[in-house]
């Protein structure tokens, strides 16, 4: 796929950008206001084009642990959720940080506390920037103000996560996730081969044949 100009929602842009980055896997669970990420990936069917795995897990806890397993093999794995769903993922995120594994987490925030509302919110700032889960760690946090930044931060988030071997988060809110803007989608990048992963990620748990 070449560079392309489209009109789309921020959540849809996340899905398109993940495919075009060459992501290996997305594992998620529906929750308003970010469900379009998973819905768009299901519609685009990247497993038939790039070989990207897309799976709706049985829960948020299962989804983040699937990301954990993918990240341990050096794959570009990601998930997305919204505020209470991200809270359920915190133990898995903490384990990713402890294991020094790269991963991308997208939080399209909604109001809280508790189950909260489906209205947009920016209330998860401290949870995201101060670590969230137990232990002494900090995420790399990218906060988009536009749909274009939602797109650009997918590649940047993955690149920073692999550079520093730590999870990174795109911290958006329901407004950016739902509003539509013109977006310049980047050209398609190929997924890395096993040999490239072995060279670039010597820490990865890959089978040697």
Model-derived features: positions:
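Short, solvent-exposed polar/charged micro-motifs at secondary-structure junctions
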Residues: 65-66, 152, 180-181
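Thiamine diphosphate
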Residues: 1-131, 138, 174
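Proline-rich intrinsically disordered, low-complexity coils
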Residues: 30-33, 102, 113, 144, ...
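Conserved thiamine diphosphate
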Residues: 120-174, 198-200
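Short, solvent-exposed amphipathic alpha-helical segments in soluble enzyme
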Residues: 42-44, 94-97, 155-160, 185-188
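Conformationally flexible catalytic loops at phosphate/diphosphate-handling active centers
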Residues: 165-207
């Amino acid at each position: 796929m070449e560079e392309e100009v489209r009109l789309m929602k921020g959540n849809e842009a996340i899905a398109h950008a993940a495919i075009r980055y060459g992501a290996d896997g997305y594992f998620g669970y529906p929750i308003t206001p970010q469900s379009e990420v998973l819905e768009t990936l299901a519609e685009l069917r990247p497993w038939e084009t790039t070989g990207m795995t897309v799976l709706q897990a049985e829960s948020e806890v299962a989804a983040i642990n699937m990301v954990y397993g993918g990240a341990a093999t050096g794959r570009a794995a990601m998930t997305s959720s919204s505020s209470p769903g991200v809270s359920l993922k915190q133990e898995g995120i903490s384990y990713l940080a402890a294991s020094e594994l790269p991963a991308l987490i997208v939080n399209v925030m909604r109001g809280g506390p508790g189950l909260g509302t489906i209205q947009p919110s920016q209330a998860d700032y401290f949870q995201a920037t101060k670590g969230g889960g137990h232990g002494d760690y900090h995420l790399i946090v990218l906060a988009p103000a536009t749909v274009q930044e939602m797109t650009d931060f997918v590649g940047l988030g993955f690149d920073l996560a692999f550079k520093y071997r730590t999870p990174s988060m795109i911290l958006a809110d329901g407004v950016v996730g739902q509003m539509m803007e013109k977006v310049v989608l980047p050209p398609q990048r190929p997924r890395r081969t096993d040999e490239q992963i072995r060279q670039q990620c010597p820490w990865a748990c890959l089978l040697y044949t």
